[in-house]
């Protein structure tokens, strides 16, 4: 195996060397072609001379001989002519001491050989030109010099190591005069050897000189000449004959080939030896690794078996302990269940007795109500007929009025033009008079202001003294009241803290969720206020147009299924278009929330049924973007504290205006002073708060009511939640994304928390809106019906129920009483008229 591998490696190396040699030959051929093309472009002034030969000579009429030169033949061989007497041969002596010294040295050298300057042919005058006529010879020499100024280069050959190639040879004449004599033995030739690196620099400079201007060419040529002259002085000069130069080149090439073959053989041997060593080392290493692997595998198997036995023992002990605990817990739970069943039976018996009493009283009231209903229906029919007649009359009157108004408008326009001219003249006159009066009034005002300032200072001093006395008295009274309230609150199920009264029910989480939502909502508003100043014009225009579309869509929501589907698709599209940046998405969601809450004051307070289509649109959009529901609840809790629920209590040294502001009363200014009063009355405030609560109840009802999502991809994954309150719940019918604060459990928690608080003037209004919207759903649902019944029983208790009957709330209290009586008779509350639209 070792022998075959070494043979293969040697063969591959030989093939690589052969390929490299072929590549070098191809490169040399390409260089030859490039050099030929470059020199032909220079108008054939420079001829590329490789080792060349002389062709058959021709005789001219004047007795001269023309000799043509061809490539691949030495220019230094015999010159033949037709004159037999004048033919000469140059005897070359190879026994020259200079050649031996030249071969021993590795330094740079210079061989001078005279060259005949000519084009494609050279004219020699053999035996005719007299030696004494020197003037004619000089004239001919000058003419030839003018035509043949440029140098001729030899074709490239393979470079031997340490020796320059013939590509870098340039041939020049040794002397100024090119007189051709009969004897060629005394001729000398200049062969200048250039380094290959210098030749490349010259070629690169020539390519750059064609692109640059003439001025730069002249400067570079002068610099190159100076450098060449300096380097040529340092080189050694040797005088050689033509045959000796060829002999040197051939000999150097042979030595180069011998050296290369030796190096290749040595490297092949080294590679074979290394290959054998590496192979033996790898085999030994593989054997060691296998032994180690088997030993480790056996150890691991033993450890695993031991650990498995220990785990089985521990698990059996834990099972026994768990069984004992389970049996003890079962016995305790059975005893508790028996006690609860007894208590439930006692409560059911009490309620049945109360129901029988109510049924007898309600039967008589039903008869009276039926009579009233029949009378009321007759009146309605009569009123409808009257309204139809009035509408027809009004239409006719409108048409007549419109015609009259058009005539009057034309007359008024003409009058207005006249009056406008008269007014302009009067205004000019009045302005002049007013300016004079104003100057007089300013003087009088300045005097009055000085007097008033003095009086105000005296009044302020008196008021400050009175306020200090009143504050001290109020503080003492508040401390006494707080002590009494804290004692009473501990007996009841609520607590007072930081001007807020909220429930102490441990199962309720509404107040904690309210705090978390308010924090996250404040963070979003800060983010929008910070980024608002950094927006570009395009972003501002997009936000403005998007808010317009949202306002139009929410204003056009009506109680029809087509309108609801259309508006939900528009709102979803507006959020999808704003997903370019986080700022735009949050701003669109906030604009939807603001506009939907503004509908409470404009529509829902006067017409509660309009809350259901709006709630359905918001729930459908919230299924795809749950962060909208979270923002809606946070802003709704800020507007109306009773949706949490909690009551507002006075703080220390707090004015009545700030208390009413925290309760939710509307003021003319955002910043409230101590003496400011709310714009609305107490009845208007109660109606507006009930509008917010009706929207909250409608959101719960529509989130629990089954419906088909209007969006094209309801099952697709929604966007990332801003607050993290959204949870995906799988129903039996379909999977939909529901917020955990909009379901039956949250509504029962709200009702428990409100019952645990001490009733106020507004509590009867809150119960009425809650039962009219959600009473039917909670009473019919199997899971919530029993718990709902228990909570209603707590409301009916005398201590709680009678406290709601306060002066000014008789209407809402009687309405609540009627609703509860109907519930105990029928077992359900009536459904709201606007639910099924």
Swiss-Prot record:
One of its GO terms (cellular component) is spindle pole. It comes from the Eukaryota. It is found in: Cytoplasm; Nucleus, Nuclear pore complex. GO terms for molecular function: inositol hexakisphosphate binding; phospholipid binding; translation initiation factor binding. Residues 1-65, 132-234 are annotated as: Disordered. Residues 7-46, 134-145, 198-212 have a biased composition (Low complexity). It holds the Pfam family GLE1. Residues 213-234 have a biased composition (Basic and acidic residues). One of its GO terms (biological process) is poly(A)+ mRNA export from nucleus. Residues 525-571 form a coiled coil. Its main location: cytoplasm. The keyword Coiled coil applies. Signal peptide: none annotated. Residues 171-188 have a biased composition (Acidic residues). Keywords: Coiled coil, Cytoplasm, mRNA transport, Nuclear pore complex, Nucleus, Protein transport, Translocation, Transport. Required for the export of mRNAs containing poly(A) tails from the nucleus into the cytoplasm. May be involved in the terminal step of the mRNA transport through the nuclear pore complex (NPC). Belongs to the GLE1 family. May associate with the NPC. This is mRNA export factor GLE1.
């Amino acid at each position: 195996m070792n022998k075959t591998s070494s043979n293969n490696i040697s063969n591959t190396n030989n093939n690589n060397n052969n390929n490299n040699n072929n590549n070098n030959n191809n490169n040399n051929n390409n260089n030859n072609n490039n050099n030929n093309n470059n020199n032909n472009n220079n108008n054939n002034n420079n001829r590329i001379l490789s080792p060349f030969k002389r062709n058959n000579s021709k005789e001219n009429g004047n007795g001269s001989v023309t000799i043509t030169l061809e490539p691949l033949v030495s220019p230094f061989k015999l010159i033949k002519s037709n004159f037999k007497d004048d033919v000469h041969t140059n005897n070359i002596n190879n026994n020259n001491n200079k050649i031996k010294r030249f071969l021993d040295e590795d330094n740079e050298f210079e061989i001078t050989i005279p060259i005949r300057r000519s084009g494609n042919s050279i004219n020699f005058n053999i035996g005719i030109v007299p030696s004494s006529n020197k003037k004619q010879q000089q004239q001919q020499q000058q003419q030839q010099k003018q035509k043949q100024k440029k140098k001729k280069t030899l074709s490239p050959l393979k470079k031997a190591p340490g020796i320059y190639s013939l590509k870098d040879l340039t041939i020049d004449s040794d002397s100024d005069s090119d007189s051709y004599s009969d004897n060629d033995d005394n001729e000398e030739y200049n062969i200048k050897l250039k380094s290959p690196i210098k030749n490349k620099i010259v070629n690169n400079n020539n390519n750059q000189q064609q692109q640059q201007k003439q001025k730069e060419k002249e400067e570079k040529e002068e610099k190159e000449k100076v450098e060449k002259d300096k380097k040529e002085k340092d080189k050694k000069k040797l005088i050689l004959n033509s045959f000796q130069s060829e002999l040197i080149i051939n000999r150097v090439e042979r030595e180069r080939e011998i050296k290369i073959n030796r190096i290749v053989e040595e490297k092949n041997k080294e590679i074979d030896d290394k290959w054998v060593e590496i192979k033996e080392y790898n085999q030994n290493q593989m054997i060691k690794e296998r032994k180690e692997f088997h030993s480790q595998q056996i150890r691991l198997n033993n450890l695993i078996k031991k650990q498995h036995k220990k785990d089985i023992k521990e698990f059996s002990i834990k099972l026994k302990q768990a069984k004992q605990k389970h049996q003890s817990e079962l016995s305790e739970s059975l005893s508790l269940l028996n006690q609860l069943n007894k208590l439930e039976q006692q409560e059911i018996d009490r309620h049945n007795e109360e129901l029988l009493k109510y049924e007898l009283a309600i039967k008589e009231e039903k008869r009276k109500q039926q009579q009233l209903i029949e009378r009321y229906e007759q009146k309605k029919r009569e009123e409808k007929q009257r309204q139809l007649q009035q509408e027809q009359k009004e239409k006719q009157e409108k048409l007549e009025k419109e015609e009259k108004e058009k005539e009057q408008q034309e007359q008024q326009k003409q009058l207005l033009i006249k009056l406008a001219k008269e007014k302009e003249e009067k205004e000019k006159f009045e302005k002049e008079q007013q300016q004079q009066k104003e100057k007089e009034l300013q003087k009088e005002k300045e005097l009055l202001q000085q007097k008033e300032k003095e009086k105000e200072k005296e009044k302020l001093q008196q008021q400050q003294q009175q306020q200090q006395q009143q504050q001290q008295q109020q503080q003492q009274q508040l401390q006494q009241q707080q002590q009494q309230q804290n004692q009473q609150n501990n007996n009841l199920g609520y607590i007072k803290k930081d001007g807020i009264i909220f429930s102490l029910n441990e199962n309720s989480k509404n107040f904690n969720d309210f705090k978390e939502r308010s924090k996250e909502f404040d963070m979003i508003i800060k983010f929008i206020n910070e980024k608002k100043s950094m927006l570009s014009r395009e972003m501002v225009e997009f936000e403005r147009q998007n808010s317009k579309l949202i306002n139009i869509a929410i204003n056009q929501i009506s109680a029809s299924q087509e309108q609801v589907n259309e508006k939900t698709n528009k709102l979803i599209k507006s959020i999808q278009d704003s997903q370019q940046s986080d700022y735009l998405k949050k701003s669109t969601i906030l604009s939807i929330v603001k506009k939907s809450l503004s509908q409470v004051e404009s529509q829902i307070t006067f017409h509660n049924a309009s809350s259901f289509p709006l709630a359905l649109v918001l729930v459908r959009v919230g299924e795809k973007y749950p962060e909208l529901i979270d923002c809606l609840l946070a802003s709704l809790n800020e507007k109306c504290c009773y949706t949490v629920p909690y009551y507002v209590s006075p703080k220390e040294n707090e004015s009545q205006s700030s208390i009413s502001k925290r309760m939710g009363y509307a003021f003319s200014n955002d910043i409230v002073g101590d003496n400011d009063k709310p714009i609305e009355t107490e009845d208007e405030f109660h109606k507006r708060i009930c509008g917010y609560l009706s929207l909250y109840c409608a959101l719960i009802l529509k989130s629990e009511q089954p419906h088909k999502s209007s969006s094209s991809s309801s099952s697709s994954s929604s966007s990332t939640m801003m607050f993290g309150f959204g949870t995906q719940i799988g129903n039996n019918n379909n999977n939909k994304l529901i917020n955990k604060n909009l379901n039956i459990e949250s509504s029962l928690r709200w009702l428990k928390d409100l019952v645990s608080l001490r009733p106020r003037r507004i509590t009867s209004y809150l119960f009425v809106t809650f039962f009219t919207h959600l009473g039917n759903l909670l009473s019919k649902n199997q899971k919530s019906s029993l718990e709902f019944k228990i909570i209603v029983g707590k409301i009916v208790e005398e201590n709680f129920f009678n406290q709601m009957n306060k002066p000014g709330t008789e209407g809402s209290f009687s309405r609540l009483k009627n609703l509860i009586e109907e519930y105990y008779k029928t077992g359900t509350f009536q459904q709201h008229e606007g639910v099924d639209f």
